[in-house]
Amino acid sequence: MKQYDIEKDIRYLQLLSQSFPTIAEASTEIINLKAILNLPKGTEHFLADIHGEYEAFLHVLKNASGNIKRKVNELFGTTLREQEKRDLCSLIYYPEQKLELVKNNEKDIDDWYHITLHRLVAVCRDVSSKYTRSKVRKSLPCDFSYIIQELLHEHTEDHDKTAYVNVIVDTIISTGRADDFIIAIANVIQRLAIDQLHILGDIYDRGPGAHIILDKMRRYHSWDIQWGNHDVLWMGAAAGNDACICNVIRLSLRYANLSTLEEGYGINLIPLATFAMETYNDDPCTEFLPKLSGGAASLDDKTTRLTAQMHKAIAVIQFKIEGQLIEKHPEWKMDGRRLFEHINYGKGTVEIDGKEYEMSSCNFPTIDPKYPNRLSEEETILIQKLHHSFKVCEKLHKHIRVMLQHGCMYAIFNNNLLFHASCPLNADGSLKEVEIYPGHKYSGRNLMHYTGMQIRTAFQQDSDPAEKEYAIDYFLYLWCGPDSPLFDKSKMATFERYFVADKETHKEEKGYYFLLRDNEEVIDHIMDEFGVTGPNRHIINGHVPVRTLKGENPIKANGKLMVIDGGFSKAYHNETGIAGYTLVYHSRGFQLVQHEPFTSTEDAIKLGTDIKSTTQIVEMSNRRMLVADTDIGKDLYKQVEDLKELLYAYRHGYIKEKETKKM
């Protein structure tokens, strides 16, 4: 028998004995934990770069990246017609809306209820089969918890049990509870189909519904996020960084997607519109015409013109404020980005990296060439109003708190290292030191950790005022700084893309991480630094769209690195050739699911259309992975060992059992 140092652990064991006051209860818990360790591991889903495309994202959650459709095919492949299977899937994804359609068209609704309830129970039984009854029970709505448990655990091979199940189903229908039951069990199926959701950054920008996505995530059962550069930009805006506020508004105007700003967060853009119309009334603002896609494609000429004027107005203010912040922080080494100071306003040229370029336009009525980064009086008043709107927006701050609660710069789950973009490297593949606070340089894991701490400093009430001010300023560096782990490029060529036709200036040199990440040794070195161990370890990233049309492969470094930005954003569909990836990690291994564009929620409900997805097997295990093989399994093993030590303490008289009252 194993010997324990009871005296050393006695205080902890006494606390543990309060939860398990008898030998019998401690033994029962050991049995339960051992049983859980031998269940198949739960299914993890990895998504990245959602960029406000809420309809496609929510549909992927509802269909579990095609997993529910696959299970319906396995269960009813030869017994149901294709349309019936599509309708069943559609009912699981959108129960409330689908029920309305069915009730308008179905002649014998009670018969439909009876058949459908049995089918839904069969699907629910299948998706819940890898979980303990306790975990399933916790996922059930209170109203139907007992009934669903009875239906899931009664097998209809027995004639008496069949009658029992039929009576339950008939009673659900006869009491008028069929609709509520269908909605409840459909939501349970959705919930159990995804055990853990990992979002590798960039919920915000480009698409119209980041606020809708975050409303969903506030209520989602189990998820985490590794912040992306666009998420951090919105965090900076919420914290009061005026450069971030300008960038957020500029990007929304660039894609003519103001839904998140105006409808989601109630940000008042009327002062900006008024200022832009007055200031740029005679300016065609050609370079600032919005990129139109999706719902924004139908903008009329008048709205498009106003959007371009607002776009230019906020861009000019942004470049001025960025210039001020860069001057305030010479340690960022970004002086070359103070480009308003390098314009020859008489000639209409700009000097970039020592070379003079002609500008496509040079109409800047609010710029004083002597003090080009100084805001005009009207611009100052405008930015104060916008700053106030962001600072007092309760819903925005609620969403940022959700991202802080569930998020971090990096995470390690089951031997997989997750981060959005980059781990800065030197040319030789060694980890690069980056200064994130004057005099404080970090690399690798420490860089990610302390960057995350810096972000949190900006939102903590008890932060040192000087540190908090720096943390708020630093959001701009995280967005576009050359050594930022969320950017890692030589520059962000926003100014050049607007004002310089020569495309040589648009080039953004990628950092060494992006150049070396196909090298297996480099990837192994990074994983070693982060303490990621095991024979099947990986890095998973988003950030850089995988251009499948050009033959790019999301699997790199001999399978050790996976890049899963497949272009959820409609703006990138033509570049990537697809509409996003989901990486699925289940008990049999990794599968990469490639999605085609989603038509609409309305089509999914009315026509039963689904996202067409193709699955690529990335890595299959030679045996089924169990809970014992996961991070949760390691914790459960520790709990088992602690309970064994408690049993030893009971049996050797170190701790006395306590009598428990019998119910």
Segments and roles (model prediction):
Residues 1-663:
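Feature recognizes metal-dependent phosphohydrolase scaffolds
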